Amino acid sequence: MNKDHKQSLPAVTLAAIGVVYGDIGTSPLYTLRECLAGHYGFGVERVAVFGFLSLIFWLLILIVSLKYLLFVMRADNAGEGGILTLMSLAGRNTGAKLTPVLVIIGLIGGSFFYGEVVITPAVSVMSAIEGLQIVAPSLQEFIVPLSVVVLTLLFFIQKKGTGSVGKLFAPVMLLWFLTLGVLGVRGIIYNPEVLYALNPKWAIAFFAEYRTVSFFALGAVVLAITGVEALYADMGHFGKLPIRIAWFSAVLPSLVLNYFGQGALLLSKPAAIKNPFFLLAPDWAMIPLLILATLATVIASQAVISGVFSLTRQAVRLGYMPPMRIIHTSEMEVGQIYIPFINWLLYIAVVLVIVSFEHSSNLAAAYGIAVTGTMVLTSILSCTVARKNWHLNLLIVSVLLLALLCLDVSMFAANALKIFSGGWLPLLLGFLMFIAMITWKSERFLLLRRIHEHGNSLEALIASLEKSPPVRVPGTAVFMSRAMNVIPFALLHNLKHNKVLHERVVLLTLRTEDAPFVHNVRRVTIEALSPTFWRVVASYGFKEAPDMEEIFHSCGLEGLSCRMMETSFFMSHESLILGKRPWYLMIRGKLFMVLSRNALRAPDQYLIPPNRVIELGTQIEI
């Protein structure tokens, strides 16, 4: 939520229900069905039903309640969460040798999210619309087209922002969770013995009964906790307390009641296995439930899409992705953004997935492997924070990490079979995103190092210009400078070709800190290098966007007055050429050149008026 507009705890808690729990809240649509009637073929056996219910309940307690809500959410970076935030936090107090390892872990976790997010909207919306099979079996052939239509509308409204309809998310999701609970109670009343499954002995009995097959069945149980990363990622919007209150007071009871209600129904009517969620409702409620389920899955999909936009912005600001056009869709909420490239890329991928897999059961078979992979990496990073930042006892952290990894790695291994039934898709997409991010970061680092090594001393140039000044013209010139003590290429080329300088020259460096936000007091530092040269360093958090007007305002407060329409911005446009490299580095270099050519230009990135920008080309060998 916007930090400038404090709201009451009940209001923020209600808002958290509407956004944070969309994904995990729509899991009852398909989870128990896939556990019993999916690819593992357990059927509606008493031990299987009780065993799966027990596993689902204890995963909700151990993974969601204890691991994420009580442990991982303690690791906040100025109140913000998410895998990249956790990566930055973990790297603060570690040595130079360990930091690159933590960066790779964080990037893999972020890449897994990109891979899984393609499946989430597809499986959620399809599972809701498949309720048509219960209402009118003859409409089955329209499930795929209707799913595509619903998601097409969702992706098309992204550019308009969700501020107006977003106010409806919380009431709709609250109604959804109340409906889950009521339907669950309705089922449990007819067969209350199902509550025995709360006892973990039924989970143990399940493993004893089905042995090896039961281990791989964990791949289906994981569907009950997909979306758990959203709890941590959205912490900055709502805060820890509202998210925790929402879970323990509304979401957890509703989920448990609904899962157990479905189990009770199956024990009484095994034929309901074709869709136990919808068959839990009375006939008169089918159509309203279908509409409500569709709305809930659309809201869940919206939360995932917003999460992708947020993660992408963080990656861009931290230097792991090339600059992209980021549009703010709300004047009130700083977190509401729209990234056209990511939006349409995700839309194409989601539609292709729906058309290719055709049924939510096929998608569920591919769902979960990237989620569990991210859970493993989150455990490693959070325990690193516990040791290095919180200074917990090494033995305690080691035991905690071992316990978490036993659980997470078991679920990740159980999902390994999904690779052959579609799980390769999120892994492939995640791998491609990881390659793109690591390529951009590493090649950009090498490029800046090359510029620094071959650059001339800034101090020497300023001293020379003060002794033998060139022709001066009125006004202020701003030169974007990446390296602090190296002459910007644009400044050199301006002197070489135009042989003039402005009366005042500002060398502007933009820095991204590993904190989500930077206080305005620390925003800008100014250093006078000579009577006509100034160095300005503007610092921003990885969840903020540089604002040139704000920078100029801060400069004015420090005594350096700059007016946008009286300032010329000189920027270098780099033309990259590949030098001699091994074949594998040649491929990486070509990918970097493609990313660079399609990156958002600096004037567009910093919203500088086009008529105030002068771009000077320079050729650099990489």
From Swiss-Prot:
Compartments, as annotated in UniProt: Cell inner membrane
Domain of life (superkingdom): Bacteria
Topology term for the membrane: Multi-pass membrane protein
Segments forming a coiled coil: none
Predominant location category: membrane
Cross-referenced NCBIfam families: kup, PRK10745.1
Native organism taxonomy: Bacteria, Pseudomonadati, Pseudomonadota, Gammaproteobacteria, Enterobacterales
Reaction catalysed by this enzyme: K(+)(in) + H(+)(in) = K(+)(out) + H(+)(out)
Record GO cellular component, one term: plasma membrane
Molecular function GO terms recorded: potassium ion transmembrane transporter activity; symporter activity
Pfam families: K_trans (PF02705), K_trans_C (PF22776)
Family: Belongs to the HAK/KUP transporter (TC 2.A.72) family.
Keywords: Cell inner membrane, Cell membrane, Ion transport, Membrane, Potassium, Potassium transport, Symport, Transmembrane, Transmembrane helix, Transport
Name this polypeptide is given: Low affinity potassium transport system protein Kup
Chain's role: Responsible for the low-affinity transport of potassium into the cell. Likely operates as a K(+):H(+) symporter.
Transmembrane segments: 9-29, 52-72, 99-119, 137-157, 165-185, 213-233, 247-267, 276-296, 337-357, 363-383, 394-414, 419-439
Species: Sodalis glossinidius (strain morsitans)
